[in-house]
């Protein structure tokens, strides 16, 4: 008898089973829905990408994304994650299906999964339909940026645009503006601040803080807290750390701009509580300072320098301050006003103050008097000591170190607007004792260059190329004002350089004079006596003196520096020179001195002696008695490096640097002397063949001139075969210190491939050498392709080279090249340039003679190169380049 099985099922259970199997068909349509979900999700991601691109473009234009767009993007991101999770288990879920996908082995599990897929598909479809935005952004609400009052400016428009654009770059979080006092940094900064009001609410808050010198962190925190409405009594009683926490808490959720005006040292943002600007938070910190060094400490290693105004802009500003009423009162006043404006050298502070002072002066005589005061003692000009010099003096005070301050004041001894030769300036400093007691010239000079860098970064001096610096005229007046004890001791520094004097100026109290500079005048004779018992520096260079009276120097026992250079007719030193017992620096270069006085041997402290281009000096006999001598220059002197001279020089045991001319027979130099040579001139060697490989032993050689000599090539080091003489270790250059090279009238030389081993060349001049066909020969440099020449070259001068066809066989980078001069080189048709060769093309010039009459006279690497450098070709003119004729600057 068969058995029977009976099961009772409730209606609710039957309904649930029915819904699983039939109601929504989640299982039956699972595979179809999965395929649809994948397609719809791909479409959604594409739409999402388009929307994000639109948002990015609009936000770059300082628009703000719509809230609905942000909500949609958030939902898409959430759905995308959910979809990836669902699809990751698809293979497992499909394995559960049976009956051709109409049913499942695990009905409830498949039902739940199918339902999730169906609902997600509907959500994705909905998002796809909602993603068609007509607008994704809107103008931001205007943030509350209170405009700062500013005066109309002239000549700062380009600088404002450049500074604003740089600050708004995504990769720039910190930006510094640096420049000398009174140059207009704060005015420019205010205009940048006010532009934030123009662009609306791109930033949540813009904070302006005047920092000034010596400000404490607590004061900065208080100023910032007031802007953030934090500064109540409870907050004021907190310590700096807690205040920083509060400031950070408020700012970290905001897109802020912090503008710090007039900082003198690094501002510790973290200690204040400022979140560090980044590409993520898109915040900005901007500041002004007088110090480039501070810019680096703050994290801006490419700060923007605010410079003085160009002459025409300066004149416009000055005219505005003086006013049309005064300028039109007499036609002569306009010309006199131009002269006064020029005295300000483009410094807005001076232009504003002096322009306002002169605005009521309607008589020609008043303007003539003003010019006279400027020329004789500018510090006495009305308002100069009240409104201009004290502002500039802050930079001087910030130097701190008294030696650096002395170095700065020393620069005021040079003429207005005159370029100062760095190395000679530092040698003066060394002898004056400003640099310390280091007896090693190289170390002392290195320290001097560090001090020079400090003055340059403080914007008290301006760098001019590699070899020179210059002091702004108004800064110079400030230095002279300080040196005179603020006008109380005007004869501390007697400075009348480059003013056309024909005689020594009258001095009331010679005993008060510490420094005297009468350089660059027309003084022919000194007839007065002086009792300069305190004088330490006497500059008489570049006059028309024929001698120096003994009576004039009799009382100068403290004189340390005496410069008589460039008195072309000067032929005799008095025997009273022996009384200058403190003398350390004596420069007689470019004079007609015929012999050294017997009393010279009494100068026991003399350490620097320059006899460059003393072409009438026949002997330096007795120089070996100058036992303290550390530097001797004989380049271009009639005294050449013959056996008798070298014998004397070998006795100078403290000698550290030698500049000398070698001619006639090649003398085998003492090894110690060879290492001391820094500047060498070789002339009149007509041997054939001639080998200058001995130069490689001169490890301190910085300047080399070869003239009227006969040799085919310079061998850097001995090698196994003639053909491989350049195949040496390129990591050990032969001429590491060589920075200046002149080759003149060397008619056997065909190339200068050996200069590959002079990686620090700054100046290269090749002149009147008829066989030179290329500068660097490709075949000889075959194994040296890893060496890139001319990376530090600033001046390339090629004169009268009839066979020259090539400088280098392919384009080269010239990172710092300023000028390329090519004259009478008819076969040179292509320069080693491409479109990326020179980074600062706006500062680069090519001078060619004869000038190319048509564009196709020169061959270019490509059209981009041609278009980039054609504007750089300028009319030919004669220059005196640094390094030409060595130290004749």
From Swiss-Prot:
* Coiled coil regions, renumbered to chain: 19-64
Q: Recite the UniProt keywords alphabetically.
A: ATP-binding, Coiled coil, Leucine-rich repeat, Nucleotide-binding, Plant defense, Repeat
Q: What is known of its domains?
A: The LRR repeats probably act as specificity determinant of pathogen recognition.
The coding gene here is UNI
Primary role: Involved in disease resistance via the salicylic acid (SA) signaling pathway. Involved in shoot architecture development via the cytokinin signaling pathway.
> Where are the residues of the annotated region Disordered?
131-152
Q: Where are the LRR repeats?
A: 510-532, 533-555, 557-580, 581-603, 604-625, 626-652, 653-676, 698-721, 825-848
Q: What is this protein called?
A: Disease resistance protein UNI
Q: Which GO terms describe its biological process?
A: defense response
GO molecular-function term, one example from the UniProt record:
ADP binding
UniProt key word Transport = no
Residues noted as binding ATP in the record, renumbered to the chain:
179-186
Query: What does the sequence similarity comment in the record state about its family?
Result: Belongs to the disease resistance NB-LRR family.
Chain ranges of the NB-ARC domain: 137-440
Gene3D superfamilies referenced in this protein's UniProt entry, alphabetically: Helical domain of apoptotic protease-activating factors (1.10.8.430), P-loop containing nucleotide triphosphate hydrolases (3.40.50.300), Ribonuclease Inhibitor (3.80.10.10), Winged helix-like DNA-binding domain superfamily/Winged helix DNA-binding domain (1.10.10.10)
What InterPro entries does the record point to?
Apaf_helical (IPR042197), LRR_dom_sf (IPR032675), LRR_R13L4/SHOC2-like (IPR055414), NB-ARC (IPR002182), P-loop_NTPase (IPR027417), Plant_NBS-LRR (IPR050905), WH-like_DNA-bd_sf (IPR036388)
Species: Arabidopsis thaliana (Mouse-ear cress)
Q: Which domain of life is it from?
A: Eukaryota
* Additional remarks: The gain-of-function mutant uni-1D (T-DNA tagging) exhibits bushy and severe dwarf phenotype, due to altered shoot architecture caused by enhanced axillary branch formation via the cytokinin pathway. Uni-1D plants exhibit constitutive expression of pathogenesis-related (PR) genes through salicylic acid accumulation. 'Uni' means sea urchin in Japanese.
């Amino acid at each position: 008898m068969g058995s029977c099985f009976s099961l009772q099922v409730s209606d609710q259970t039957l309904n649930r089973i029915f819904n699983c199997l039939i109601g929504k068909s989640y299982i039956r349509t699972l595979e179809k829905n999965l395929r649809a979900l994948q397609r719809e999700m791909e479409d959604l991601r594409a739409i999402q990408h388009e929307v994000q691109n639109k948002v990015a473009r609009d936000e770059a234009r300082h628009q703000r994304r719509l809230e609905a767009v942000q909500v949609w993007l958030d939902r898409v991101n959430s759905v995308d994650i959910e979809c990836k999770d669902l699809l990751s288990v698809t293979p497992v879920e499909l394995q559960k299906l049976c009956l051709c996908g109409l049913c499942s082995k695990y009905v409830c599990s498949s039902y739940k999964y199918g339902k999730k897929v169906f609902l997600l598909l509907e959500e994705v479809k909905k998002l796809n339909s909602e993603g068609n935005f007509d607008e994704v952004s809107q103008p931001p609400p205007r943030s509350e940026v209170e405009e700062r009052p500013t005066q109309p400016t002239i000549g700062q428009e380009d600088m404002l645009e450049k500074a604003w654009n740089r600050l708004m770059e995504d990769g720039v979080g910190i930006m510094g503006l640096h420049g000398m006092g009174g140059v207009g940094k704060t005015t420019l900064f205010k205009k940048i601040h006010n532009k934030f009001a123009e662009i609306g609410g791109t930033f949540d808050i813009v904070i302006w803080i005047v920092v000034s010198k010596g400000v404490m962190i607590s004061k900065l925190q208080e100023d910032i807290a007031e802007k953030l409405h934090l500064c109540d009594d409870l907050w004021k009683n907190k310590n700096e750390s807690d205040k920083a926490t509060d400031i950070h808490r408020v700012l970290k959720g905001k897109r802020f701009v912090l503008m710090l005006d007039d900082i003198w040292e690094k501002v510790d943002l973290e200690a204040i509580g400022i979140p560090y600007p980044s590409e993520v938070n898109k915040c900005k910190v901007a500041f002004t300072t007088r110090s480039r060094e501070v810019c680096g400490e703050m994290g801006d290693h490419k700060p923007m320098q605010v410079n003085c105004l160009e002459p025409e802009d300066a004149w416009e500003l000055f005219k505005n301050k003086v006013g049309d009423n005064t300028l039109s009162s007499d036609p002569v006043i306009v010309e006199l006003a131009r002269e006064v404006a020029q005295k300000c050298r483009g410094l807005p502070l001076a232009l504003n103050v002096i322009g306002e002072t002169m605005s009521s002066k309607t008589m020609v005589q008043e303007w003539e008097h003003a010019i006279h005061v400027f020329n004789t003692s500018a510090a006495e000009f009305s308002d100069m000591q009240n409104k201009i010099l004290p502002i500039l003096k802050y930079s001087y005070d910030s130097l701190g170190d008294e030696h650096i301050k002395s170095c700065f004041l020393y620069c005021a001894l040079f003429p207005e607007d005159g370029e100062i030769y760095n190395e000679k300036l530092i040698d003066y400093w060394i002898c004056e004792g400003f640099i310390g007691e280091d007896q090693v010239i190289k170390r002392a000079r290195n320290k001097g260059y560090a001090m020079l860098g400090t003055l340059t970064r403080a914007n008290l001096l301006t760098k001019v190329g590699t070899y020179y610096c210059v002091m702004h005229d108004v800064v110079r007046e400030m230095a002279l004002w300080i040196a005179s004890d603020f006008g109380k001791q005007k004869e501390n520094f007697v400075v009348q350089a480059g003013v056309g004097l024909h005689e020594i100026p009258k001095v009331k109290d010679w005993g008060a004079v510490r420094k005297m500079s009468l350089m660059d005048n027309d003084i022919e004779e000194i007839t007065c006596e002086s009792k300069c018992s305190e004088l330490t520096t006497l500059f008489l260079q570049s006059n028309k003196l024929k001698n120096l009276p003994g009576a004039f120097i009799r009382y100068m026992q403290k004189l340390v520096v005496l410069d008589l250079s460039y008195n072309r007719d000067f032929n005799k030193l008095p025997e009273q020179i022996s009384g200058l017992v403190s003398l350390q620096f004596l420069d007689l270069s470019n004079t007609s001195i015929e012999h050294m006085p017997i009393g010279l041997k009494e100068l026991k402290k003399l350490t620097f002696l320059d006899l460059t281009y003393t072409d009438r000096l026949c002997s330096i006999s007795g120089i070996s008695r100058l036992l303290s001598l550390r530097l001797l220059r004989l380049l271009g002197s009639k005294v050449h490096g013959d056996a008798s001279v070298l014998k004397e020089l070998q006795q100078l045991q403290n000698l550290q640097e030698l500049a000398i001319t070698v001619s006639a027979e090649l003398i085998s130099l003492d090894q110690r002397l060879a290492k001391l040579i820094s500047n060498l001139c070789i002339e009149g060697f007509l041997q054939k063949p001639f080998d200058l490989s001995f130069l490689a032993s001169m490890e301190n050689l910085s300047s080399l001139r070869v003239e009227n000599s006969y040799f085919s090539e310079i061998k850097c080091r001995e090698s196994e075969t003639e053909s491989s003489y350049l195949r040496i270790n390129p990591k050990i250059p032969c001429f590491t210190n060589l920075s200046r090279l002149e080759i003149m009238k060397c008619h056997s030389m065909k190339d200068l491939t050996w200069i590959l081993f002079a990686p620090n060349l700054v100046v290269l001049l090749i002149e009147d050498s008829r066989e030179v066909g290329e500068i660097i020969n490709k075949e000889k440099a075959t194994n040296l392709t890893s060496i890139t020449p001319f990376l530090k070259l600033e001046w390339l001068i090629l004169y009268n080279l009839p066979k020259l066809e090539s400088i280098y066989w392919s384009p080269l980078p010239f990172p710092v090249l300023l000028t390329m001069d090519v004259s009478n080189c008819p076969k040179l048709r292509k320069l080693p340039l491409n479109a990326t060769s020179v980074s600062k093309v706006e500062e680069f010039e090519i001078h060619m003679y004869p000038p190319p009459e048509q564009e196709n006279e020169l061959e270019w690497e490509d059209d981009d190169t041609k278009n980039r450098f054609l504007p750089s070709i300028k009319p030919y003119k004669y220059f005196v380049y640094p390094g030409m004729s060595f130290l004749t600057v």
